[in-house]
């Protein structure tokens, strides 16, 4: 599983300029099964994505994100193996 941390590198007006395209890309990625959760950081300095796809598919998808393409955010991809989860989240366990 992967946690992807996005950190904005540009002023918020530039983030907002690219936001609609980013949201459209994000919806497509959800439809393709790349991500299982996404949201903004509080305070609004970036966002977090959660993915259970393979690394090659993840990297290919991230390369299409308008925030990446236009240099709006930097991306940190962190892999981890879940070995304990709350009830109802068994699908997140690594086998």
Question: What kind of region is each of these model predictions?
Answer:
Residues 1-95:
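Conserved, structured core segments of small domains
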């Amino acid at each position: 599983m992967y946690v992807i941390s996005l950190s904005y590198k540009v002023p918020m007006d530039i983030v907002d300029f690219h936001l609609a395209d980013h949201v459209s890309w994000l919806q497509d990625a959800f439809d393709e099964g790349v991500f299982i959760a996404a949201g903004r950081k509080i305070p609004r300095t970036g966002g977090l994505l959660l993915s259970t796809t393979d690394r090659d598919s993840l990297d290919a998808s991230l390369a299409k994100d308008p925030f990446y393409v236009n240099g709006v955010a930097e991306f940190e991809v962190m892999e981890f193996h879940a070995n304990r989860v709350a009830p109802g989240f068994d699908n997140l366990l690594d086998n």
